[in-house]
Amino acid sequence: MTQVFQGRSFLAEKDFTRAELEYLIDFSAHLKDLKKRGVPHHYLEGKNIALLFEKTSTRTRAAFTTAAIDLGAHPEYLGANDIQLGKKESTEDTAKVLGRMFDGIEF
């Protein structure tokens, strides 16, 4: 079964079918196995990912950065001091602009 996730956000499990969730879990296990065996892969080669954090989070930031690099992506960390969410710029406007600039956004 071919899964189409492009253009979709993972906000809640209820937004996905059981088959889609099982696919995501199986694919995650596949990626973990490749990493464990030292098999290189670049599923996200050439993709740019914005990592937006409202609060500092060492483990979460490190996990997302490492995962993005392992997959061949280029992560860009944008912390609370780097962006003006809801201050000088509306959150909606910021999301639209970043959505055009990046292939994926972690928030």
UniProtKB/Swiss-Prot annotation:
UniProt site positions, description: Important for structural integrity: 32
Keywords for the protein's UniProt record, in alphabetical order: Arginine metabolism, Cytoplasm, Transferase
Cytoplasm in keyword set: yes
Entry's EC annotation: 2.1.3.3
Residues reported to bind carbamoyl phosphate: 57-61, 84
This protein's pathway: Amino-acid degradation; L-arginine degradation via ADI pathway; carbamoyl phosphate from L-arginine: step 2/2
This protein's GO CC annotations: cytoplasm
Gene3D superfamilies tied to this protein: Aspartate/ornithine carbamoyltransferase (3.40.50.1370)
Subcellular location, principal: cytoplasm
A single MF term (Gene Ontology): ornithine carbamoyltransferase activity
Example of a GO biological process term: arginine biosynthetic process via ornithine
Subcellular location(s) per record: Cytoplasm
Keyword ATP-binding in annotation: no
Recorded catalytic activity of this chain's protein: carbamoyl phosphate + L-ornithine = L-citrulline + phosphate + H(+)
UniProt record similarity statement: Belongs to the aspartate/ornithine carbamoyltransferase superfamily. OTCase family.
Protein name: Ornithine carbamoyltransferase, catabolic
Protein source organism: Streptococcus pyogenes
